[in-house]
Each structure stands twice: as C-alpha cells, then as structure tokens.
C-alpha cells in the first residue's frame, strides 16, 4: 500500500483526494483532520487512551514531497496514545483505527506542527499527509513487571489521584475465565481493599487513576488473589483476573505535611496494628503499605521533644524490621537488606535486624556477608541457636558453591583445551596436505622436465 512518491498511480496528489473524500474525525468538526481508510482492519477492537501503539507510517507535505518514513528505517514507531507524545492529528487519527488497518490522514497545521514547523523538514503552517498502518497495540504496563495492565475506556477528570489511605468510591466488575464473579459499588480505603475482598492490584492501580476514569485492569496472580485464590468467589490459586473499574469519587488522606507530630504518632500506632494483622494473615504486600506509612510520616520528622523522639524512633525501628520480614516473604531480598540497614542505623546491635539481614544475604548467595551478620547476632546474644545453625548453613553453602564453581571452570577449561587441540590438529593436517600437494607438484614438474629432455 505504500509508495515512495506522494502521487497516486494516475498522477493525482493524494492531498487533493483527501480534501474531497476524507472523513472529518475531529470533535470540533473543523476539518482539521481528514481520514480515508485504505485497508480495513483485521479486528473490531481499537486502541484505548494510554495504550502503547505500534505503527508504520510515511509522511509527506501537501505537495507530495516525502519528509519521513518508518519503512525507510525498517523499524515500527511506538508511542502511548493520547499522552501528547505525537502531534494532535495522530492521537485523534490512530484512536479511530483497528489493528491491521491502513489509513490516510490529512492534517491541518493546528493539528500538526503549527507555525513553528519542525526541524528543517516541515515548514511553518504546513498541511501534512500521512499513510499509517496500525500494526499492534497493548495496554499500559503500570508497574513495568507485566503484573497490572491498564486499558482506559474513559479518561478521568482533572489531574488529581487518590493517595494511599484515601477513601474511594468505585464500581467494579471482576471476571475470571469469562465468568463474572464480582459486581458492586464499594467504598473502601486505598491499601485496605483486602478487607472488602478486593485484590491488591486494584489498590495499586487506583493511585494512578483520576475521578470518573473507567478502565480495564488485567491482573497477574501476584496482584490478584495469589497462591491462596479466593474460594468465596470460586477463584483458583494463581488465577489471572480482569476487572473493569470506575472511580466515582475519592477523598484524599492527609499528606505528611498536613499532620502535626502528635497526629503522626497516633496514626503510626494504628497502621502498625493494621500491618501486623495483614502480616499474620499472609497479606505481605498489604502489610508493606501500612508499614511504609510510618516511614513516610516519621523518617524526616525533626524538632521533636525527647518523649516524641523516643516514640518516633521506636515506631521507625519496628516499621523497618517488619518491612524487612515482609520483603523476605515476598522474596525481594535487596529491599529486605535496605530495611535492615535502616533499622541498624537506629540500633546497630539490634538482634532482629542483624539476623534478617543475614537471612536476606544468605538467600542472595552472599555467604560471607551473611555469616558475618550471624556472628554479630551471637555477639549480641550467644544463646541464639538459630544463628549458630545459619553460620553452619553459610559454611556448607559456600563450600558447595565453590565446589560447583570449580567443576564449572574445570569443564570450561577442558572444553577450551579440547577445542585448542582440535584447532592444532586441523592446522597440522592442513600443513601436511599443503606440503603433500607441493611435493606432488614438484614431482610432476620433474617428470615433465625428464620427458622433455628425453624427447630432445
């Protein structure tokens, strides 16, 4: 469907055809963006606001001169739809396309580069012609781990988002395997959705939503109901879920700067207890949310009285130690080490902090550091039998690791030696072949000379 020239087969400029036949797809109906479908798409689904879209395109000025082409670069162009990453005409035009569709767009300056133009290729107030092929699109990966994919059906209002602790009113519909298992309006506190049988992925997504936004969320098991599943809803362990969520309204929780020290200490006691309840119930991600609140409120709090300072330090120490335990359970060992470091910064001889950091380092195969921490535990409490066992574990694991490395390197060197021997043998064989060929050639030449002499 693409050509290198800006004219059609009969020599007609496509911009002229667009002006006559193009559909006005602007909301204002000001003919700022005209569209003609050149090839119908392969599905009925169109990309949504925020989707990552992949296109091939060719751009021309209104006189037919090509100024850009992804085909020339042999690489599709990708952008997030509706985020202002491309000219307005593209956000408008691509949102109307279906996967596999090829269309032509004619874009007036106010929907393109306006009076500024672009670099030296596009002059001021230029009307542009594009041929675009929509190759693919996919939802926004909210946390860049493929755990929560969002597709926005209706863009929200304003720029404000709920924060952790905000009270939200939402409508949600949950589906699994094509079956709707939950459909209701519900009011809850962000970070405490578990209390209302709402998976943690919804809590985390809500802090990225705006009022009246309607979106589809695809949740992986980690952000859904996890290994436990949800028998109440008939959800099996490690099931993937789909939710359609509408954020009807929300009231933000107080930010740290809006609270005085007394209020922060009061709230710290409350969320510490909530975190403990979640932890005991195996809801480690939810527990992390609660313990992190304590850190956000108190870590940078200054000008406290002696009594407030002691209370603050006690809450922070407990929060860091509990966060470390949560991260150990979640297998996020680097974060566990960081939290232990923070705890030990408050109390360098803290037995739990040293032990948990040792555990995390052992699980990261840093045997020497782990052994060092467990030895420090014994220095603090010589009766800690678990630390003694862990030291033995570190020594055994280090020995096994070194033995495994020795075998790997021995096999590696053996392979290198065998390869070198083959190369030497090959070279020697080649040399003999060359010498043999040279000898035969010399012998042949001598025979020819003998024949010549005999003939004479």
Curated annotation (Swiss-Prot):
Molecular function (Gene Ontology), one example: protein-macromolecule adaptor activity
Source organism of the structure: Mus musculus (Mouse)
Catalytic reaction equation(s): [protein]-peptidylproline (omega=180) = [protein]-peptidylproline (omega=0)
Expression tissues: Widely expressed, highest levels found in the liver, skeletal muscle, kidney and thymus. Expression is regulated during adipocyte differentiation.
Protein name, entry field: Peptidyl-prolyl cis-trans isomerase FKBP5
The organism's taxonomic lineage, starting at the top: Eukaryota, Metazoa, Chordata, Craniata, Vertebrata
Post-translational modification: Acetylation impairs ability to promote interaction between Akt/AKT1 and PHLPP1. Deacetylation by SIRT7 promotes interaction between Akt/AKT1 and PHLPP1, leading to suppress Akt/AKT1 activation. Ubiquitinated, leading to degradation in a proteasome-dependent manner. Deubiquitinated by USP49, leading to stabilization.
Enzyme class, spelled out: isomerase
Primary residence: cytoplasm
């Amino acid at each position: 469907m693409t050509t290198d020239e800006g004219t059609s087969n009969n020599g007609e400029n496509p911009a002229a055809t667009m002006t006559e036949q193009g559909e006005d797809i602007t909301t204002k109906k000001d003919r700022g963006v005209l569209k003609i479908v050149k090839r119908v798409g392969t599905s009925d689904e169109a990309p949504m606001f925020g989707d990552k879209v992949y296109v091939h395109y060719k751009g021309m000025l209104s006189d037919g001169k090509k100024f850009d082409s992804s085909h020339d670069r042999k690489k599709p162009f990708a952008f997030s739809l509706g985020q202002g990453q491309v000219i307005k005409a593209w956000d408008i035009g691509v949102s109307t396309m279906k996967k596999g569709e090829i269309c032509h767009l004619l874009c007036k300056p106010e929907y393109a580069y306006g009076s500024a133009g672009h670099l030296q290729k596009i002059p001021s107030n230029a009307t542009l012609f594009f041929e675009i092929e929509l190759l693919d699109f996919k939802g926004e990966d909210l946390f860049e781990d493929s755990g929560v994919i969002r597709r926005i059906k209706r863009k929200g209002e304003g720029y404000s988002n709920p924060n952790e602790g905000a009270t939200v009113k939402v409508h949600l519909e949950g589906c699994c395997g094509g079956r709707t298992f939950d459909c209701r309006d519900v009011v809850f506190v962000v970070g405490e959705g578990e209390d209302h049988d709402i998976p943690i992925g919804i809590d985390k997504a809500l802090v990225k939503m705006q009022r009246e936004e309607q979106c589809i969320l695809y949740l992986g098991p980690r952000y859904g109901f996890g290994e436990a599943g949800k028998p109440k809803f008939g959800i099996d362990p490690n099931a993937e879920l789909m939710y359609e969520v509408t954020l009807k309204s929300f009231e933000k929780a107080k930010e740290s700067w809006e609270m005085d020290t007394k209020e922060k200490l009061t709230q710290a006691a409350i969320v510490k207890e909530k975190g403990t309840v979640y932890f005991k119930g195996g809801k480690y991600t939810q527990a992390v949310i609660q313990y992190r609140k304590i850190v956000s409120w108190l870590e940078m709090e200054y000008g406290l009285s002696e009594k407030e300072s002691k209370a603050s330090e006690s809450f922070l120490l407990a929060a860091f130690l509990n966060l470390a335990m949560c991260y150990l359970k979640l297998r996020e060992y680097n974060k566990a080490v960081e939290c232990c470091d923070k705890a030990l910064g408050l109390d360098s001889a803290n037995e739990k902090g040293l032990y948990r950091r040792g555990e995390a380092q052992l699980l990261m195969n840093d045997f020497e550091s782990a052994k060092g921490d467990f030895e420090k535990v014994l220095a603090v409490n010589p009766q800690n039998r678990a630390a003694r066992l862990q030291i033995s574990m570190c020594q055994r694991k280090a020995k096994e690791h070194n033995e495994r490395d020795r075998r790997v390197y021995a096999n590696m060197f053996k392979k290198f030696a065998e390869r070198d021997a083959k190369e030497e043998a090959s070279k020697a064989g080649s040399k003999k072949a060359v010498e043999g060929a040279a000898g035969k050639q010399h012998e042949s030449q001598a025979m020819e000379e003998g024949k010549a002499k005999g003939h004479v």
